[in-house]
């Protein structure tokens, strides 16, 4: 279509997107408000388990979830097609697949392991935020989840690493009046002087990709552990720390 490659998977992606969007609008029409902040498509009640629910009582959520997975999967496969046509690696669809994995973990894998679709999150702005808050408090302090710590660390490290790279590039190609534009060797020299090491212009992008994918994978893992594999408050998980032999020294 014009300059955009569509292909078979582009068509299937468009189908799932339009169907899912129409179902969200239908669900909003069944609800009490058209306030964009308050619209919510909730999953079935826990009493339905892993069964199919009536449309107005969670069935729409189930179909919308199928549409979302279909749209995301189609888009990833479309990216594979485009990558092959361009003769490049599959880095982009592989990276997007990690984001898809995180979504599927939240809406399919974790609810399956916990025995009810009602453990998925609702589709809505405020209702989604409420779900995040309630899920966190269900485990007393979610920040004590070790994989949550890893995920947050990787998210912030991704931002820091790519911000350092981006700011250096802007500084190199926008010199003060009277100075020449700097190139990669100047950038390498700057970081060798700054922190003693330069990963290089290609390496920083690979590092950014690695950190970002690690953050997505760790975030999926942290919620997957909560419920199916750990049902207590996360602070109590750290009890092993108090029993390390090192604390026995000094008579304590």
Swiss-Prot record:
Organism phylogeny: Bacteria, Pseudomonadati, Pseudomonadota, Alphaproteobacteria, Acetobacterales
Membrane topology: Multi-pass membrane protein
Protein name listed in UniProt: Reaction center protein L chain
The keyword ATP-binding is assigned to this record: no
Similarity annotation: Belongs to the reaction center PufL/M/PsbA/D family.
Residues passing through the membrane, by range: 8-30, 58-86, 91-113, 146-173, 200-225
Organism: Acidiphilium cryptum
Any one GO CC term of the record: plasma membrane
Subcellular location: Cell inner membrane
Keywords: Bacteriochlorophyll, Cell inner membrane, Cell membrane, Chlorophyll, Chromophore, Electron transport, Iron, Magnesium, Membrane, Metal-binding, Photosynthesis, Reaction center, Transmembrane, Transmembrane helix, Transport
Function comment: The reaction center is a membrane-bound complex that mediates the initial photochemical event in the electron transfer process of photosynthesis.
Binding positions (a ubiquinone): 191
Keyword Phosphoprotein: no
InterPro entries: Photo_II_D1/D2_sf, Photo_RC_L, Photo_RC_L/M, Photo_RC_L/M_CS
Binding site for (7R,8Z)-bacteriochlorophyll b: 128, 148
Record GO terms (molecular function): bacteriochlorophyll binding; electron transporter, transferring electrons within the cyclic electron transport pathway of photosynthesis activity; metal ion binding
One family name in Pfam for this protein: Photo_RC
Domain of life: Bacteria
